[in-house]
Structures are given as C-alpha cells and as structure tokens.
C-alpha cells in the first residue's frame, strides 16, 4: 500500500542508504541517534553505528543528513 508519505520517504531514505550518508535522527522524546541507514520498511528504520538499532518510524521526529542528498537519481531506479 503506497501513500503520499511513502512517495516522499522511500526515495529520501533510499538515497541516504545507497550513498552511505551519515544521519542524525531525532526522536519525538528529544533523543538524538546517529549512524547510517542500513535498511527500512513501512514501519521501521535500521540505523547502523557500532551496533544496529531498529527505530520505529512513529518515534522519529526528524532525519538530518550530514550532507545534501541528490534525489533526482532515484527516478532512474524505477
């Protein structure tokens, strides 16, 4: 089931994953997590640092990449 949110989330998270861009993930409770996106699905993001953490998307407030991400490359993958 694809909705508008997935149409925005998936290309962004996939670009971060493919390019191994370091990210800071801020949770709704204010905690900051850092690492690389290892994988993701509709409900969770796997964040890799010294260990792999499974972070539920409903707990995420903001994803901040360490550098700019080119999303135009994602249209070629489809």
Curated annotation (Swiss-Prot):
Gene Ontology terms for molecular function: RNA binding
Q: Which UniProt keywords apply?
A: RNA-binding, Stress response
Under the heading InterPro entries, the entry gives: Hfq, LSM_dom_sf, Sm
- An annotated GO BP: regulation of translation, ncRNA-mediated
Sm domain segment(s): 10-69
Quaternary context: Homohexamer.
Pfam families on file: Hfq
Mind telling me which Gene3D superfamilies this protein's record contains?
2.30.30.100
Q: What is the primary gene name for this protein? A: hfq
Against PANTHER family, the record matches this protein to: RNA-BINDING PROTEIN HFQ
Out of the domains of life, which is the source?
Answer: Bacteria
Per the entry, what this protein does is: RNA chaperone that binds small regulatory RNA (sRNAs) and mRNAs to facilitate mRNA translational regulation in response to envelope stress, environmental stress and changes in metabolite concentrations. Also binds with high specificity to tRNAs.
Query: What protein am I looking at?
Result: RNA-binding protein Hfq
Q: Which GO terms describe its cellular component?
A: cytosol
Q: Which organism is it from?
A: Herminiimonas arsenicoxydans
Q: What is stated as this protein's family in its record? A: Belongs to the Hfq family.
Lineage here is: Bacteria, Pseudomonadati, Pseudomonadota, Betaproteobacteria, Burkholderiales
């Amino acid at each position: 089931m694809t909705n508008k949110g997935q149409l925005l989330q998936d290309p962004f998270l996939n670009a971060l994953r493919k390019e191994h861009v370091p990210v800071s993930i801020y949770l709704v409770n204010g905690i900051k997590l850092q690492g690389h996106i290892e994988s993701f699905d509709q409900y969770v993001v796997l964040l890799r640092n010294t260990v792999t953490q499974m972070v539920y998307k409903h707990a995420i407030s903001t994803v901040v990449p360490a550098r700019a991400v080119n999303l135009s490359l994602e249209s070629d993958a489809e």
